[in-house]
């Protein structure tokens, strides 16, 4: 088993190797060419300065990783020591089991012998048989639930008015009362004595209107002077304005060619 100082030294060596890998080692560096090595050198040089925010964040992360590495060293060493102790205990237990394998297996007390048949007295002492003297339970019976009745309800149970006051009920609509049969005078005005005895001296005759005048075109033109004005709100029509049907004949047309002159 390694001593504590030796483990501390090994841990520090591992931490220094990790830090060398992070910061870079000029001795063991693979030559990757100018396109890779020069930008990497520029990037590492920029990160080494604390002029920009990215470099400051990079330094903070480096310090945090170093702090985590050295602070967790004590916890990891304790865990490793506990693991080694557990491994030694397991080895000792294995040696003890090998040495005691020739002894008889340990059985807990009050365990029945599996070679003998089971005895009811041993399994459940005091049990003689099924309980035949006790009547069986009756199922499918309606159980009446018991409810609590307060002393106030018991005191006013004989007084219905108090019960109604204790448990208010909703109001029910009352029936409509029958309206009295009054005589209505809201009628058409009638002359005294009725229409038969009314005076017939004044007679009104509805004048006769000549409805033909309303349809007279002269009256319509006079009533609407804009009716004779030309309207341009018309639908588009074809080349033939009179809507004459076109007749297509299959007979050969006559040769109406114009004779050419001598100049042509």
From Swiss-Prot:
Keyword Cytoplasm: yes
One GO biological process term: skeletal muscle fiber adaptation
Residue(s) carrying Phosphothreonine: 107, 111
Keyword Ion transport on entry: no
Subcellular location: Cytoplasm, Myofibril, Sarcomere, Z line
Gene Ontology CC: one annotated term: Z disc
Transmembrane segments: none
GO function terms (MF aspect): actin binding; FATZ binding; telethonin binding
Segments of this protein annotated with the region Disordered: 98-134
Biased composition (Pro residues): 106-120
Record function comment: Myozenins may serve as intracellular binding proteins involved in linking Z line proteins such as alpha-actinin, gamma-filamin, TCAP/telethonin, LDB3/ZASP and localizing calcineurin signaling to the sarcomere. Plays an important role in the modulation of calcineurin signaling. May play a role in myofibrillogenesis.
Name the record gives this protein: Myozenin-2
Record organism: Bos taurus
Phylogenetic classification of the source organism: Eukaryota, Metazoa, Chordata, Craniata, Vertebrata
